[in-house]
Every structure is written in C-alpha cells, then in structure tokens.
Amino acid sequence: MKHLINIADHSAEEILGLMDEADRFREALEGREVKKLPTLRGRTVFTLFYENSTRTRSSFETAGKWMSADVINLSASTSSVKKGESLKDTGLTLASIGADAIIMRHPSSGAAQQLAGWVAPEGQGPSVINAGDGSHQHPTQALLDAVTMRQRLHLGADRSAAGTGFEGLKVTIVGDCLHSRVVRSNVDLLSTLGAEVTLVAPPTLLPFGVDTWPVRVSHDFDAEVPEADVVMMLRVQAERMNGGFFPSHREYASLYGLSKDRAAAMKKDAIIMHPGPMVRGMEINYAVADYDNTAVLQQVNNGVHVRMATLFTLLTNGENAGI
C-alpha cells in the first residue's frame, strides 16, 4: 500500500489489516507512562492543511511523534501558498526536501489523488494520506469510526477467516450527507465490510446520484432510530452552503436532530457517534452528547491509533518490528 486516498480503492482485507494494526498500537501503548515507540525514527512527515482542523491534524501529529517520526506542520495561510504557489509546486518542494509522507487536507475533491501523481510518479516518492478533500473522502475518519464500532459493539471477537464481524450491522447516518466527505468514506468502508447503511436527511441534503450508492435512504428519522445499532450524526456544513437548504435551524433540529426522546427510542446497546466538530443544540441535544452510549471521545482516541497504523503501514510496508 503506497497511499491512502480513497477507501473504495482498498479491499476488506486491507481495511481490516489497518484496523487490526490500530488495535496493536493501542495495546502496545496501554499503560506506558512515556508514549514513545521507535517505529518511524528517521522518517519525515509533513502535514499540509488548506482547511482548519482540530482532531485530524492534532491526531496525525501525535501519531507521528509517538512513533518517533519528525513531524513538520504547514498551513496554507503561513506558507508560500499565500504568495500564489500551486499545489503541484508545494508538493514537489516537500518531496525534494525529503518528505516520506505528506498528509493533506484540501477544499477541492480529488486534490489528494492529483498530489500523489505529482510527487510519486510510478510509485516512487512520498506517500500521500488524504486527510479530507472537499466533500469527497476522509479515509482515516471512516477507519477510526469502524474501529470504534468494533470495540463498543464487540464485533468480530470470534471472526472467522471469511467474515468481518460487520455483517448485518445497521448503521444510520443522519444529517448533511450532501457536503460530507465522512459519509462517503463510511459508506464505502461499511458496505465493503457487509454492514447495512441508511442515510437520513432532507432531500436537499442528499448527494446527487445517491440512488446508485449501496445504502437505503429515508427522510423519517423517527422511523429509523429504533432499528439502528449505530446512529451517526453529521454536522450541517454551513460554510459550504449559500443558504436555502432547509427553512430554519429550529426546524432542522426538530426533524433531524438527536433529541432526548429519539435517544431514548434507540436499542439498549446501540451507540451514538459523531465525527466532529459537534454543534450541540443543532444536530445533537446538549445532554445527549454526553450520554454513556455516546462514543465521540472514543472516536477521537482511536483516531491516534488509526493514524499510527496508517503511517506505519505506508512507510514500512508493515515490516518494521518496532512496535
């Protein structure tokens, strides 16, 4: 595996391999006072973010540093991009400096794929990890979500060679599916592993061509809540809208927000997830966000281990015994 750009490019075996690797890193670090492994000593990792980020950027930086890599953070606002430098020239500059990996977030769908073609033609050059490209993909978010589901719901504890543990799992994703890269990566990953995915959103917030996706579509949140093993709430991405997608925030919250009543209607063992950032009082009730069956902070924690697994796999081909 050279790059991680699009979940759809990877098999169930590769996906489960990354998830298993994340579990191994979590176990290796558990109980350590000093969270430091020599796994990527001497490797140079650049983060290149053209959009704001808290969880993704900080967890990638933490992942690299916990494996002893040299992590260098770049922001478009403080780099030569501000002077008009193109993505291609920025990428080639980092490759020439000696980058082993470039972790990039970019507002344009497909930007990560373009970057990989420029900096690693014919597979020679730094690995590119897509930390979010427009409304297209966010592969490590889908991986950490799947790891969290597996932990909380004890999926695949006795997994056979032929199974994934996700077969028949019912995942309901609610909210702004139109602008969400998270929903696309999760649909690709979960359908590959055999889960059943339902999207719940107003018609104006569903992606074009969603009828060709391996999902069910519903506009009735109340009807779907009791059936779900996982309810994943999505933020309304107002920064990508010009208005007119729904009448008001109050009406949206009434129809598509996870209220106390809807949370009470969930299965006893069902869990609540959110990729963040959460807007309490909009897509999720203030109190519900802190319920015991809400896995948001566990998702964040798993993000570090998933990103460790990703860097480890791409930069060592999984052959370094440094864990």
Curated annotation (Swiss-Prot):
Carbamoyl phosphate binds at residues 55-56, 105, 138, 141, 276-277. L-aspartate binds at residues 83, 181, 235. This is Aspartate carbamoyltransferase catalytic subunit. One of its GO terms (cellular component) is cytosol. Gene3D superfamilies: Aspartate/ornithine carbamoyltransferase. GO terms for biological process: 'de novo' pyrimidine nucleobase biosynthetic process; 'de novo' UMP biosynthetic process; amino acid metabolic process. Coiled coil: none annotated. Keywords: Pyrimidine biosynthesis, Transferase. It catalyses: carbamoyl phosphate + L-aspartate = N-carbamoyl-L-aspartate + phosphate + H(+). It is an enzyme of class 2 (transferase). Catalyzes the condensation of carbamoyl phosphate and aspartate to form carbamoyl aspartate and inorganic phosphate, the committed step in the de novo pyrimidine nucleotide biosynthesis pathway. Heterododecamer (2C3:3R2) of six catalytic PyrB chains organized as two trimers (C3), and six regulatory PyrI chains organized as three dimers (R2). Belongs to the aspartate/ornithine carbamoyltransferase superfamily. ATCase family. Its EC number is 2.1.3.2.
